[in-house]
Structures are given as C-alpha cells and as structure tokens.
Regions:
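Membrane topogenic/interface segments and analogous intrinsically disordered interaction regions
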Residues: 4-246
Length: 246
C-alpha cells in the first residue's frame, strides 16, 4: 500500500470516529438529565446543589454530553487504530496490540467504576460531615464545582488503573524491570502523595484515598514487571555484535 492510499484510509477512519463522536454527543444531550442524575446521586444526601450563573446548568449538560461522546468514541477509535496498524504487524504483535487496547479500555472502565461506587461517595460524605459541630451551617455547592470534581476523579482513577498495563508494556520492551521499580519505590510513593495532594480537595483523607490505590497499584506493577520482564539474552547480544562487525 502506497503512502497516498494509507493517508486516504487514515482520513476515512478519522471521519468515522468524528461522526461517531458527534452522534454520541447529540444522543447524550437527549439523556443529559439522566446523566446528571447519576452524578448527583452520590452527593444528594450531603449537599444541596445550586446553579449560580444563568448558563451554569446548561453548560454542565454540554460538558457531560461531550464526555459521554468521548466514551462512546474511544472503543471505535481503538478498533480503527488496530485495523489501520494490523497490516504492518506480525501475528504475535497483532495479538499483543489488540490485547493491550482491550485491557487498557477495561482497566480505565474499572477505575471509573471504582471511583463512582467507592471513592466518591466516601469522599463526599467525609467532606460534608467529617467535622463535628457547626450543624447550623448548610452545605451547598454549585453544580459546576460538583461536576468538575466528579469528572476529575473519574479521569484520575481511570488513568491510575492503567499503571499495571503501562508497566507490562515497558517491561516487555526492557525499559524498566522489577529491580528498578523496587529501588525507586520510596521516591515513587512520595511523588504519588504529591500528585494526590495536587488533584484532590485540601484534606488529608481525600489525599490518602487517592494515594492509597495508587501505591497499591504500584506494588502490583512491581509484581507484574517480574512476570513480564525478559532480560536481553546472550544470543541477542551476539547478534548485535555481529551487526556491529558488519
């Protein structure tokens, strides 16, 4: 296949992904009320939601619909990336490429579900009722701030749950190994808590709730790296030396 044909195929696949995204956004707008209901269900017992600006409620509908459109488009985009790259891949590479995309999508969904079912309800409850006293203070929040917090946590946990997959890929490529991960685990834990402090509300409980799963996934990644890491064999070294001699 010449470059012109490849570019034409790539353009057609990008157009398909764009059409799927637009359709996903339009359809999601019709169900925006239900999507907002799903998000607010986690904090409805602890917060009273208000719309401060005239356009605030409408903008959240668009924001949630766009995110839903992205979610619908991602599997389609993954398929077209695989289909476009498949002719240039070996059979083993094609299988590994396909498994990486499927596992990556599954892990991201697990991370979002983990945040929605476990982390966010606990975090919202603590932020609302974690401090005793001042019962006369009514807890309210703008719908924009609430949606921003929810979507941020979903994206963070979705990405965090990709850590084992990234470790597997880098270990198979020989870029990292379990020994290296063990040596830098102290620094990694400090970085994890720093990141958690930046992306979470300013309280120690929220920080630990985000950092805890990240630290656990880091140690799981060390274990997986030990399974998938393959050090360079002597045969490969000899082949490299022969190529250098030539």
């Amino acid at each position: 296949m010449c470059i012109r044909d490849s570019l034409k195929e790539l353009r057609n696949r990008l157009i398909i992904c764009a059409v799927v995204f637009v359709v996903g956004v339009v359809v999601s707008l019709a169900y925006a009320d239900r999507l907002i209901d799903l998000l607010t269900a986690m904090g409805r017992d602890y917060y009273q939601f208000v719309s401060i600006a005239p356009q605030e409620k409408l903008m959240q509908y668009f924001r949630v619909s766009i995110l839903a459109g992205v979610i619908v488009t991602v599997p389609v985009a993954f398929y077209h990336i695989y289909a476009f790259a498949k002719p240039g891949l070996k059979k083993s590479e094609s299988f590994f490429f396909k498994m990486v995309m499927l596992l990556g999508l599954a892990l991201f969904c697990v991370g979002v579900l983990f945040a929605y079912k476990l982390m966010m309800p606990f975090m919202l409850r603590f932020l609302s009722t974690g401090i005793e006293g001042a019962e006369y203070i009514q807890t309210t929040t703008s719908i924009e701030s609430y949606v921003n917090l929810c979507l941020t946590m979903f994206i963070i946990f979705g990405c965090v749950f990709e850590m084992p997959l990234i470790t597997i890929i880098l270990s198979k490529m020989g870029i990292i190994n379990p020994t290296l991960l063990k040596q830098v685990r102290g620094v990694a834990i400090v970085i994890i808590f720093f990141i958690a402090a930046v992306v979470t509300p300013p309280d120690i409980v929220s920080q630990c709730m985000v950092a805890g799963p990240m630290v656990l996934l880091y140690f799981i990644s060390i274990f997986l790296s030990g399974i998938f890491y393959k050090p360079k064999s002597d045969d490969d070294d000899e082949d490299d030396e022969e190529e250098d001699d030539e």
